């Protein structure tokens, strides 16, 4: 959610996701939210889209209070599967497990942008039995 997003949003130059075509995958900086973060999400909703926040577990500035506020606004959460495998460090893994345990995730995906990156992550990581169970029950 940056100035380029705002420009594209105003021009209706958006790439929606989902079977109904009204999901909008969004992300922010890992360290700071945009100044008008909640207002932007509300504008997205008013335009008929459902905001989907990519990898909420990776945002260092967020805590449970932030996650609960976002969920109360109707924002869906997409877990980065490699976060659950510990690829982004212990703090991200801890947040990922907490969000999973609270049933806050709606979708799963990866943040891999090419096949080489995917292969590296897959070769390095394994999930525990408990993590696999959590994924299986993810919004059945």
Over which residues does each language-model region extend?
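Short acidic/histidine-rich active-site segments
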Residues: 105-120
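Active-site metal-binding loops of divalent metal-dependent hydrolases
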Residues: 56-58, 82, 112-113
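Short, hinge-like loop/turn segments at secondary-structure boundaries
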Residues: 13-14, 69-72, 94-98, 124-128
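Mid-to-C-terminal alpha-helical segments outside catalytic/metal-binding sites
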Residues: 122-140
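Short, charged, surface-exposed secondary-structure boundary motifs
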Residues: 62-63, 86-90
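Conserved short secondary-structure transition element at the edge of the structured enzyme core
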Residues: 77, 96-108
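His/Asp/Glu-enriched short active-site or ligand-binding loop at hydrolase and phosphoryl-transfer sites
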Residues: 75-86
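Extended substrate/RNA-proximal surfaces in nucleic-acid metabolism proteins
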Residues: 1-77
């Amino acid at each position: 959610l940056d100035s380029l997003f705002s420009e594209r949003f105003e021009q209706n130059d958006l790439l929606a996701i989902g079977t109904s075509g009204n999901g909008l995958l969004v992300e922010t900086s890992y360290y700071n939210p945009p100044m008008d973060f909640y207002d932007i999400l509300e504008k997205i909703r008013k335009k008929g889209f459902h905001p989907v926040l990519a990898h909420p577990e990776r945002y260092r500035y967020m805590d449970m209070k932030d996650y609960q506020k976002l969920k109360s606004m109707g924002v869906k959460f997409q877990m980065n599967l490699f976060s659950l495998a510990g690829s982004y460090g212990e703090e991200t893994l801890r947040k990922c497990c907490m969000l999973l345990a609270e049933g806050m995730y709606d979708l799963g995906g990866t943040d891999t942008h090419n096949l080489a990156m995917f292969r590296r992550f897959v070769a390095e990581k394994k999930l525990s039995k408990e993590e696999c169970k959590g994924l299986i029950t993810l919004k059945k």
